[in-house]
Amino acid sequence: MSSGLIYISLEVLVACLITALIMYYVMKKIYYARGQAILKGASAKAKLMEFQAKSFVEAEEMRMKSQECKLQQQYENKNLQLQTHFDKKEAHLKHLEAQHKEFVRDEKRYLEKEKKELEKERQILEQERENFKKQRAICKEAQAKALDAMLNYMAYTKDEIKSMILEQLEEELEAQKSALIRRYEKEAKEEGKKKSYAILAEATARFAGDYATENLTSRIALPCSDYVGRVIGKDGKNIEAFKKISGVDIEFSEDSSELCLSSFNIYRREVASETIKILIEDGRIQPNRIEEVYHRVARNMEKELLSEGESVVLELELGTMEDELKILIGKMRYRFSFGQNALQHSKEVALLAGLIAEQLGGDKKLARRAGILHDIGKALTQELGRDHVNLGVEVCKRHKEDPVVINAIYAHHGHEEIMSVECASVCAADALSAGRPGARRKSDEEYAKRMQALEEIALEFDGVEKAYAMESGRELRVIVKSNQVRDNQVPIIARKIAKRIEESTQYVGEVGVQVVRENRFKTTATLKQ
């Protein structure tokens, strides 16, 4: 039994071995066949890649050859062009060289010819000079013989005759010199006159300014007729306080739609006009409020004057200038002379003077500065009541202005001789600006002078603080200092002022003199919590 099992096991084992061998052989054949297939595929792919690479290389070689041929052709074409251009340039240079050589030969021939001619002329001149020397010697000898012969028959010596001849020549030369001087002076005057006309014509042609006329009244519209009573106030206190502090007349239209402010002093009227506008807009109109607003407007107006002056200085390119002078320049906007605005007139003079000075070779900037400041004193005349020339000189000297400016202020009214081109330009420009037709009117200026004269008379008395000419000169309101004038002195001062007006003025009519003395006390109460 056991041997039979062993026999079966051996058979099975042999069968397994045979099967394994068969499987091994089959798998080997399979793998071999697969390897051969892979090798064949790889070989085919390698051959394909080799073929593609070979084709690519051949294509690149063909492209490179084509590119090389193309570049070779371009090079040959470019070389041909350059060679052609070079040949043309070379031919042109050879032509120029030939022309230059021909020109040099011609010049050389011409110079040789000129040299020969000059040599001939030199020889001729040498010959003529020798002949002249001989002739001169002969003439001197003949002159000496003639002089000796003449002296033998005359009573004068040689020196006396020479002196007589020289005196006669001197007289003739003096007469000729006088005639020449007179002729040149006449020609110079005529030429100077023509030149001055030309300069003035060019200056006026290049300048065009604005012109303003004087208006002695300002009209302000009222929101409604109720404001008439509010402006007048209880028992007229508001309007009296307004007149007292501003020095301006105030009247109402018949339909109570507007009020009219009038004063010969335009700056004073402008401050009053702004004050009444603010009061009407605010609605609170009472004496204390009027005084407060008036002082605030006056301070603001001074700032506006400085701004106006700075604008003028900047417009005329004058450089630096003291603030006081700028304020006075701005204030000239509210000053009229013979109906002509002082600031506009001064700007005209400055611009014209600059143009004229430039034509005459002077300092344009300095001429403009002298032109804008030549009437600066007019901004102070209504307050200080003196001649505007002296006032202008004082304020300009105080701020160390250039002597040319001082000379222009004096010279434009004939107080000094003209010392410079710039000063002469200012005087000419002033005459042009003031002398044009319609520039000035005398009636307004005479009225302003009459009003100013009344105020100046009152201000001459001791104790007088302010004086306002009102009602077109029919009333003079005088405010005295309460700490210097007593109540019993007020009528005396009023009578003295009235008498002085009667003696000093020559106008027909009556002037009412109203003297006001006021005591005002102010204290402060401290509230405790």
From Swiss-Prot:
CC per GO annotation: plasma membrane
EC supergroup of this enzyme: hydrolase
Subcellular location: Cell membrane
GO BP annotation list: mRNA catabolic process
Function: Endoribonuclease that initiates mRNA decay.
InterPro entries: HD/PDEase_dom (IPR003607), HD_domain (IPR006674), HDIG_dom (IPR006675), KH_dom (IPR004087), KH_dom_type_1 (IPR004088), KH_dom_type_1_sf (IPR036612), Ribonuclease_Y (IPR017705), RNase_Y_N (IPR022711)
Name of the protein: Ribonuclease Y
Main localization of the protein described in the UniProt heading: membrane
Segments forming a coiled coil: none
Family affiliation: Belongs to the RNase Y family.
PROSITE patterns: HD (PS51831), KH_TYPE_1 (PS50084)
Enzyme Commission numbers on file: 3.1.-.-
Gene: rny
Record GO terms (molecular function): RNA binding; RNA endonuclease activity
